[in-house]
């Protein structure tokens, strides 16, 4: 019986969601930053952890600079 990577409890077939090559409980598959519940294949991954595509993954790991949502977007020089 596979174990959920988030809570380490056994994942039964009826409650299983497969994502990132692992079996999760549906409520355990959440964005690491904001906690939003994610759907299988409808999210991004960084170092084996799930993130919602927008805004969390884009803000944390996307391109930085003017107009990209990074720290420099709102800096006037």
Swiss-Prot record:
Pfam families: LIM. The keyword Metal-binding applies. Residues 2-63 form the LIM zinc-binding domain. The keyword Metal-binding applies. GO terms for molecular function: peptide binding; zinc ion binding. SMART domains: LIM (SM00132). One of its GO terms (biological process) is cellular response to UV-B. One of its GO terms (cellular component) is cytoplasm. Keywords: Acetylation, LIM domain, Metal-binding, Methylation, Zinc. CDD domains: LIM_CRIP. It comes from the Eukaryota. Gene3D superfamilies: Cysteine Rich Protein. SUPFAM superfamilies: Glucocorticoid receptor-like (DNA-binding domain). The modification N6-acetyllysine is found at residues 9, 22. Coiled coil: none annotated. The modification Omega-N-methylarginine is found at residue 68. Seems to have a role in zinc absorption and may function as an intracellular zinc transport protein. This is Cysteine-rich protein 1. It comes from Bos taurus (Bovine).
């Amino acid at each position: 019986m596979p174990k959920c990577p988030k809570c380490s409890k056994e994942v039964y077939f009826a409650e299983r969601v497969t994502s990132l090559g692992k079996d999760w409980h549906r409520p355990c598959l959440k964005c690491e930053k904001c906690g939003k519940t994610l759907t299988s294949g409808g999210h991004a991954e960084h170092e084996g952890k799930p993130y919602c595509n927008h805004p969390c993954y884009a803000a944390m790991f996307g391109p930085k600079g003017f107009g990209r949502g990074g720290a420099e977007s709102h800096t006037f020089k």
